[in-house]
């Protein structure tokens, strides 16, 4: 072990996220001066099986959302356990923190404390190695730029409007490279603003930078997007496909055992009726991917959805799998879904994140690297997407710097890779072959 790559200092602080809530930022410095800084994201619609984000609970300070406890855990406990360790041994460092926490869901130290350190260590190690983060994590073959899932209409828990589904996304699949994909997305985003204005609808944006208009139905949200695609000079389906994040756990009524779609004429639906409703949407519109179509605990409903649509579209488990290899293994075993959403703070360490992506790929499930609704300028997920050749990234709309930071970092990575960079477009959906 080289002394130069040993961890010399670990320092955490409380900073602000894109929603004006506190989050954890960690600085790690190695003996040779190599430095890494990472900020932790936070979700709005969280799966009940996610790793625990430690909040202070003091209502007199940030309404109880302070993260001083997590910061103190880094500065007083975690730092002592990893000082002097080699930053290049990510497995040992993450394992040490997980053991120090000692709980199944990281509730003692907080996933936000552990993850901040985990990512900052990797960044410092990359600097020490003289490599960009994507190359340090992914090695020689990291070169696939992801197809962006751009969330241009927000509903559900991400917006104060009457749309049931949380996200309506566009995927620029005909682009020759990421740079052009980003341009296509931006042009459709601006086109959509014009379309909404023309209908006299609100063009304020939600948490993830998408528009949050009041529309009469979920279908109308898709219709206005299709209009915007055409007005931007592109062909729906051929050039740009549609993605949905239904976030069904948010509109599932536990007592009634029904799904309540307030934007629909017949609001109450059983799992079977909801699957049929989705099937009709998929037949009618160029939908290629659907996330969290059913409640996270409705495994029988998920099985029906997978049997009905699993060969036609990508079915992504977010709240269902919570970036957890145990949950994912159950899903693979039961033939549920065909894709996993990867959110670093759902599981709480870089090692476990990479393990989930690896497990998904081995089972022919795709892995979609994702932001959270509460973000910062940290662009680690851009590097994770390229490092793992995941082929897909979900990081919001074409507004708000907290979202654009990830896209801009991908532009830089693509430029750095030069002729070695690849962009698979529609072929990224290897789970549908």
From Swiss-Prot:
Ranges of biased composition (kind: Basic and acidic residues): 47-59
Chemical reaction(s) catalysed: (2R)-2-phosphoglycerate = phosphoenolpyruvate + H2O
Binding residues for Mg(2+): 245, 291, 318
Keyword Cytoplasm: yes
Pathway assignment: Carbohydrate degradation; glycolysis; pyruvate from D-glyceraldehyde 3-phosphate: step 4/5
Cited SMART domains: Enolase_C, Enolase_N
Needed cofactors: Mg(2+)
GO molecular-function terms, A-Z: magnesium ion binding; phosphopyruvate hydratase activity
Active site: 208 (proton donor), 343 (proton acceptor)
Chain residues that bind (2R)-2-phosphoglycerate: 166, 343, 372-373, 394
Pfam families recorded: Enolase_C, Enolase_N
Chief location bin: cytoplasm
InterPro entries xref list: Enolase, Enolase-like_C_sf, Enolase-like_N, Enolase_C, Enolase_CS, Enolase_N
Compartment annotation: Cytoplasm; Secreted; Cell surface
Enzyme Commission (EC) number: 4.2.1.11
PROSITE patterns per record: ENOLASE
UniProt entry keywords in alphabetical sequence: Cytoplasm, Glycolysis, Lyase, Magnesium, Metal-binding, Secreted
Biological-process GO terms, alphabetical: glycolytic process
Function statement: Catalyzes the reversible conversion of 2-phosphoglycerate (2-PG) into phosphoenolpyruvate (PEP). It is essential for the degradation of carbohydrates via glycolysis.
Cited HAMAP family: Enolase
Family affiliation: Belongs to the enolase family.
Name of the protein described by the UniProt record: Enolase
Species whose genome carries this gene: Leptospira biflexa serovar Patoc (strain Patoc 1 / ATCC 23582 / Paris)
């Amino acid at each position: 072990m080289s002394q130069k790559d040993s961890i010399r200092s670990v320092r955490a602080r409380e900073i602000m996220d894109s929603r004006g809530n506190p989050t954890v930022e960690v600085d790690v410095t190695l003996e040779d001066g190599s430095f890494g800084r990472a900020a932790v994201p936070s979700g709005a619609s969280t799966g009940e099986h996610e790793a625990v984000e430690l909040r202070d609970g003091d209502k007199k300070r940030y309404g109880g959302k302070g993260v001083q406890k997590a910061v103190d855990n880094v500065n007083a406990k975690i730092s002592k356990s990893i000082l002097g360790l080699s930053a290049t041994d990510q497995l040992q460092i993450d394992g040490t923190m997980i053991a120090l926490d000692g709980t199944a869901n990281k509730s003692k130290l907080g996933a936000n404390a552990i993850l901040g350190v985990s990512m900052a260590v990797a960044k410092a190690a990359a600097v020490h190695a003289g490599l960009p983060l994507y190359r340090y994590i992914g090695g020689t073959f990291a070169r696939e730029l992801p197809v962006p899932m751009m969330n241009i209409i927000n509903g559900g828990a991400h917006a104060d409007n009457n749309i049931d589904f949380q996200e309506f996304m566009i995927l620029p699949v005909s682009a020759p490279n990421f740079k052009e994909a980003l341009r296509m997305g931006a042009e459709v985003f601006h086109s959509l603003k014009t379309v909404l204005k023309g209908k006299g609808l609100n063009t304020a944006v939600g948490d993830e930078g998408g528009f949050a208009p009041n529309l009469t139905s979920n279908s109308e949200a898709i219709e206005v997007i299709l209009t915007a695609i055409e007005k931007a000079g592109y062909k729906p389906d051929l050039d740009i496909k549609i993605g949905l994040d239904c976030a069904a756990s948010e509109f599932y009524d536990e007592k009634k055992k029904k799904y309540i779609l307030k934007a629909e004429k017949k609001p109450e639906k059983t799992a079977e009726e909801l699957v049929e409703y989705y099937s009709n949407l998929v037949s009618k519109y160029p939908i290629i991917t659907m996330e969290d179509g059913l409640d996270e605990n409705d495994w029988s409903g998920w099985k029906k959805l997978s049997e009905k649509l699993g060969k036609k579209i990508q079915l992504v488990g977010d709240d269902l799998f919570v970036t957890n290899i145990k949950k994912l293994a159950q899903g693979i075993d039961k033939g549920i879904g065909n894709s996993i959403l990867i959110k670093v703070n759902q599981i709480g360490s870089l090692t476990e994140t990479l393990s989930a992506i690896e497990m998904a790929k081995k089972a022919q499930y795709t892995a979609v690297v994702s932001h959270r609704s509460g973000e910062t300028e940290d662009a680690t997920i851009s590097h994770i997407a390229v490092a793992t050749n995941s082929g897909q990234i979900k990081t919001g709309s074409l507004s708000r710097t907290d979202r654009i930071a990830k896209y801009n970092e991908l532009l830089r990575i693509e430029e750095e890779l030069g002729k070695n960079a690849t962009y698979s477009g529609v072929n990224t959906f290897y789970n549908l072959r």
